Amino acid sequence: MSARVLMVQGCTSDAGKSTLVAALCRWLHRQGVAVAPFKPQNMALNSAVTVDGGEIGRAQAVQAQACGLPPHTDFNPVLLKPNSDTGAQVIVHGHPVATLDAVGYHAYKRTARTAVLASHARLVERFDVLLVEGAGSPAEINLREHDIANMGYAEAVDCAVILIADINRGGVFAHLVGTLALLSPSERARVAGFVINRFRGDLALLQPGLEWLERETGKPVLGVLPYLHGLQLDAEDALPRGPVHKPQARLRVVVPVLPRISNHTDLDALLAHPQVDVQLIGPGQSVPPCDLIVLPGSKSTRQDLAWLRAQGWEAAIARHLRYGGKLLGICGGLQMLGEQVHDPHGIEGAPGSSAGLGWLALQTALQPHKQLHRVGGRLLPSGAAVSGYEIHCGLSTGAALARPLLQLDDGRSDGAVSEDGQVMGTYLHGIFDHPAALAALLAWAGLADAAPLDLASLREATLERLADTVHAHLDIAALTRLTLGEPACAN
């Protein structure tokens, strides 16, 4: 077996590449096609743990779900997790290999390319179709040398490319024509057509522009996707844009948005719940009155802890607790709740130690070996089922661990609860995802009769909706030829 390969590249970041690939994955999966996702190189702080014990970008985990597959490290062989403005942890085939600045990674690209092509070779032998997501834009002139994320990959494996652009942000024709103009002749020949994303309005008013675009470029418009509201898909990086009005909200949750916040998909169930009002606060904002504060994960715990203090939020959180509010820390947030965070090996920056917030009697030492686990278990003492994953370098010890939050199915306990029950911490990402765990945690926070919410069912419904949208709005005959029929590089 040797799979047909189709790649989706975008004119910009957040053009809709991840969503279109997920939609196409589910569209093909519904037809019984053996399809798999692939992203050669991803940069994201939201990651997922795979069945083979590594980590990949969350978008590829969602795309795997759309294909009816468990996530695997081959679906995203190179993952970059930024830990500063100029550096990132480099994860290859699911495991960290180095922390490099931009210059260092540029030199490393040849090695990364070998890893990318090795994963590609394995996947094309296992599946009938490989749907590939590019990264950012293929027209970044300064990044073209040794490119493995966009056209460099497409040229290496000889695949066709769909170019997607977001009309909602404006300038869609300039984006498409400009991107095409900056490609080499051989790269332009790979572009099989355009998809315009997030359209609102009367399509008849757009039609003259589409006809001009096809005449100007000689490339077909494969379809115009509407702006879809209420999608329940794991985000790779972007947090929700603006507040969501919830007339039925009865529980107020505040989340400090840290500079290196990671795995904020932990908040998805709260954001989706009609009775929970989630307020994300950023620099310069005060902590408003609320029932629950959630300290999220962080790729740089000590640096984000210092930043939190600089905002004046430590005193605000202490005031929140004095008035009976609840506080939950997840992963890096758990580490911040302790008494000390030690980084003797310089895992997240310069070696050193930082005083924690001191609301849980524990200390954390960052270790070179990263813990990666997919786990299930139960909340204590309620017994509510939980499922999720661990991604952390920290090893926590201390008296607070004698009051664990979770009993895991593998025999370990996890997390800690303060003596007064106001403060909880856990290493488990996805702690709100299971309906029973969500109900129990909302009851602890003050919403005793919360309406049931099943996040997994919402995600499945979204994937079905995306597949329906593709079928209704894209050129299905052309997509069928590209994925199942004609030679890859037909002009």
Curated annotation (Swiss-Prot):
Gene Ontology terms describing biological process: cobalamin biosynthetic process
Alphabetized GO MF terms: ABC-type vitamin B12 transporter activity; catalytic activity
Superkingdom, taxonomy of origin: Bacteria
Keyword terms, alphabetized: Cobalamin biosynthesis, Glutamine amidotransferase
Pfam families: CbiA (PF01656), GATase_3 (PF07685)
Record-annotated GATase cobBQ-type domain positions: 250-437
Membrane recorded as keyword: no
Keyword Calcium among record annotations: no
Catalytic residues identified in the record: C331, H429
Associated pathway: Cofactor biosynthesis; adenosylcobalamin biosynthesis
Family the UniProt entry places it in: Belongs to the CobB/CobQ family. CobQ subfamily.
Its biological purpose: Catalyzes amidations at positions B, D, E, and G on adenosylcobyrinic A,C-diamide. NH(2) groups are provided by glutamine, and one molecule of ATP is hydrogenolyzed for each amidation.
Listed name of the protein: Cobyric acid synthase
Species this protein is from: Xanthomonas campestris pv. campestris (strain B100)
